Amino acid sequence: MKTIGITGGVGAGKSTVLAYLEEKYNAFVIQADEVGHIVMAPGQECYQPVIDLFGKDVIKNDKTIDRKRVSDVVFEQPDFLSCLNGIIHPAVKRYILKSLEEQKKEGRKLCVVEAALFLEEHYQEFCDEVWYLSLIHI
């Protein structure tokens, strides 16, 4: 199985490339940002640690984490960001690695991982290629 990592700036066309690879080559596409939402859902790995860090005020009526409230706290108190990242990023990486392993077992030929902090989180360690997309204005 080949794994391609994709990263790049805002508006560089990442979503377009992901959709193309998924449609044209039947690629399994996994986006770190979406995984971040999954691991913070009720009953998932990061749910309770995030509540422990930010307090019960971040729980909405439907029991999900109020991401806006979390971002407000992080904006006002930047020290919380490194703590939050220490909870979320390792869980996202584990989830992605598990998903890639499952796809390999199912015989998938191509997987694509997209992440904003691709290099910072060392995702290149489990990718065969890394594509950095950028948009050049002329």
Model-assigned labels for residue ranges:
Residues H137-I138:
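Conserved small/polar residues in nucleotide/adenosyl-binding loops
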Residues G9:
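P-loop (Walker A) phosphate-binding loop of NTP-binding proteins
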Residues I6:
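Hydrophobic anchor at the beta1->P-loop junction of P-loop NTPases
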Residues D33, L84, V112:
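Residue-level signal for inorganic ion chemistry
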Residues H37-R108:
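ATP-dependent small-molecule kinase phosphotransfer cores
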Residues A12:
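ATP-binding Walker
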Residues S15:
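Walker A/P-loop
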